[in-house]
C-alpha cells in the first residue's frame, strides 16, 4: 500500500462493490474468544472490540473511533493508544503506518481513530500474516470475521487499486 505522507485512499463506487464480494462469516463472541487462544485476532469497531475484551479475548490490534454507529461518543480514550486521523470513506497514510508498524514490530496496539475506522480492515489484511483473524461489526446484524489468506490479500490489492488517491 504505497502512499506518501499526507495522502489517503478514497473509496469509490467500484471499490465499494468489490468489497461487497468478500463479506466475512457471521461469528459469535465465544467463537472469537476460542480463536484468540491460538491465532492472532484483530478487531475493528468499538462495540466489537469492547464485547471481545469483556469476554476475555486476546486482541492484537484494536481499532476504534470511540463512537457508536449513531455517532454517540460513549467509549473512553485509553492511555497508551495511538491516535490517528482518518476521514470517513478513506484510509489515511497515518492509519496505514500505525497498522503496518504494529504488525511489523509484532506489538499489540490500540489505535484510536479521529474520524472513522470502517475501512481499516483493508490495510490489516494487506499487512497481516496468513491465518490472522479480523473481527468487525456489522451494524444491526452482529459480528463477522475474515481469515487472512493469500487469496484474500490479492482481493484487497484489487480493491485498493480501484480506490482514488488524494
From Swiss-Prot:
Top-level taxonomic group: Archaea
UniProt-recorded name of the protein: GTP-dependent dephospho-CoA kinase
Organism per entry: Thermoplasma volcanium (strain ATCC 51530 / DSM 4299 / JCM 9571 / NBRC 15438 / GSS1)
Any GO MF annotation of the entry: GTP binding
Keyword flag GTP-binding: yes
Pathway assigned to this chain's UniProt record: Cofactor biosynthesis; coenzyme A biosynthesis
Record EC number: 2.7.1.237
Example of a GO biological process term: coenzyme A biosynthetic process
Cross-referenced Pfam families: DUF359 (PF04019)
Reactions it catalyzes: 3'-dephospho-CoA + GTP = GDP + CoA + H(+)
Keyword annotations: Coenzyme A biosynthesis, GTP-binding, Kinase, Nucleotide-binding, Transferase
Amino acids binding GTP: 46-47, 65, 67, 117, 140
Family per record: Belongs to the GTP-dependent DPCK family.
Top-level EC class as recorded in UniProt: transferase
Task of the protein: Catalyzes the GTP-dependent phosphorylation of the 3'-hydroxyl group of dephosphocoenzyme A to form coenzyme A (CoA).
